[in-house]
Regions:
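N-terminal alpha/beta PP-like core and its mobile active-site loop of ThDP/TPP-dependent enzymes
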Residues: 1-259
């Protein structure tokens, strides 16, 4: 898993170790300087650190926690990433199969169904069925995190398959998924002409800038368009700073959070 994450451009994993997730730590050690682990004091901190890493790097943030009571503490940080469309891969584990019956008897603190708990704040959740499915699982997680409207995903790696040795075929990671936007949509010529016509006919046009303008790397183009048309621009909270706030055409942040 550590090698696959490094293939997708991840250079740091934020988390709190546990016995169930030790294979990830051994893998990070084996990868040398390609990827490192940063110890956090709390699982909640790990999710916010992964969120910040994704925002700053333009890639995917990764956090990890142990089974059950560790992984479910991801919820507040993943909720922020979900609401603001930040690509994060959260990694948890699961107890051995003979422990799972305790989930229904209320005697196992680490047998909480993490996938169900985190489902409302993640785009996608999956469980590793066999170690040979690891390349497919991590690639799907990365693709889900950065495609469409980006957001967090959750991977659960049960005790036994997480400790098995990979014996599957050679694989090649899709490095296009290493940063945003992974797949940039291209409008047709007709759509471009239509947009130009709408702008020409507008009497007092105003731009509204959202977080997608940040993640698409379009700051320079947006500034050039605003200046060429003398068009003021307002921003949502996540679009704050796309057009510098000291720019003469900046209207600041709109809504109750604006000024």
């Amino acid at each position: 898993m550590a090698g696959l994450l490094a293939d997708y451009g991840v250079t740091a994993v934020f988390g709190v170790p546990g016995g169930q997730t030790l294979p990830l730590y051994y893998g990070i050690l084996d990868e040398g300087n390609r990827i490192r682990h940063i110890l956090m004091k709390d699982e909640i901190d790990a999710t916010f650190a992964a969120d910040a890493y994704a925002r700053i790097s333009g890639g995917i943030g990764v956090c990890d926690a142990t089974a059950g009571c560790g992984a479910i503490k991801f919820i507040s940080g993943l909720a922020e990433a979900y609401n603001t469309s930040i690509p994060v891969i959260a990694i948890g584990s699961e107890m051995e199969g003979d422990w799972l019956a305790a989930r229904y008897r209320g005697t196992g603190s680490q047998v909480v169904d993490s996938k169900e708990v985190l489902k409302p704040v993640t785009k996608w959740q999956a469980c590793l069925p066999h170690v040979n499915k690891m390349p497919e699982l991590v690639q799907t997680a990365a693709q889900m995190a950065v495609s469409g409207r980006p957001g967090p995903v959750f991977i659960e790696c049960p005790w036994r398959p997480f400790r098995e040795e990979y014996t599957g075929p050679d694989y090649e990671s899709n490095r296009k998924l290493a940063s945003l936007p992974a797949h940039r949509p291209t409008p047709s010529r007709d759509e471009i002409d239509e947009a130009i016509q709408v702008l020409k006919e507008a009497k007092r046009p105003v731009m509204l800038l959202g977080g997608g303008a940040w993640r698409s790397g379009a700051r320079a183009e947006i500034t050039a368009l605003a200046e060429r048309m003398a068009m003021p621009a307002a921003a949502s909270l996540t679009g704050k700073g796309v057009l510098p706030e000291n720019h003469p055409l900046s209207l600041g942040v709109v809504g109750s959070l604006g000024g």
